[in-house]
Amino acid sequence: MANTLFDRTIAFAGICQAASLVQKMAKDGHCDQEAFDTAIQSILETNPSNTVAVYGKESNLRIGLECLVRDFDNTPSGSELTRYLISLMALERKLAGHRDGMSKLGERIGTIERQLEHFDIHDEQMLSNIASIYLDVISPMGPRIQVTGTPSVLQQPMTQHKVRALLLSGIRSAVLWRQVGGKRRHLIFGRKKMVEQAKIILAQI
């Protein structure tokens, strides 16, 4: 895949979208359905033809692109999103250095793909199976991501499944970010360029 500013912006918007949806789901128990579907589908796109193919099309990343443009500020909402972002990228770095973990992740995603021949991806059991990949493969690499939200919402099993599935989608986008050449220096020194690129993409969708 190409290592361009466009590709890095798309991948980073994917991480932003996952973090934003986790925040919304944890507080309200629901989030934008199309964006959620895009996030879950991205997990299964293990051999994409290009960066955008992971998400279907640019417009499927509208929430993530808007989130990137707004940037992360010092408000409680902004700092929480930043914490999720940093945590997801830190977990992906641990995963990248863990060959067994990458192998297990691939196997478990393959199992999900086979199960989808018989079940709908929105079934509670399927979402539970996707969430269990995060619990079994990603979470033990630590440190755990502390998700904050409405306690009564977070206690619901279906919300827990969806939050963990979204966190897994964030890891998938973080893997993509690394694959297209994304590095920490791009976040420190190239943030303004990514914001400008995100604005261009948003204007075209």
Swiss-Prot record:
The record describes its membrane topology as: Peripheral membrane protein
Where does this polypeptide localize? Cytoplasm; Cell inner membrane
Query: Where are the membrane-spanning stretches?
Result: none
| UniProt keyword annotations, A-Z | Cell inner membrane, Cell membrane, Cytoplasm, Membrane
Q: What Gene Ontology cellular component terms go with this record?
A: cytoplasm; plasma membrane
Which N-terminal stretch is annotated as signal sequence?
Answer: none
Statement: the UniProt record of this protein carries the keyword rRNA-binding: no
InterPro entries, per database record? HflD, HflD-like_sf
Q: Which Pfam families match?
A: DUF489
**This protein's record includes keyword Cell inner membrane:** yes
Q: What is stated as this protein's family in its record?
A: Belongs to the HflD family.
Q: What is this protein's record name?
A: High frequency lysogenization protein HflD homolog
State the organism's lineage. Bacteria, Pseudomonadati, Pseudomonadota, Gammaproteobacteria, Vibrionales
User: By which gene is this protein encoded?
Assistant: hflD
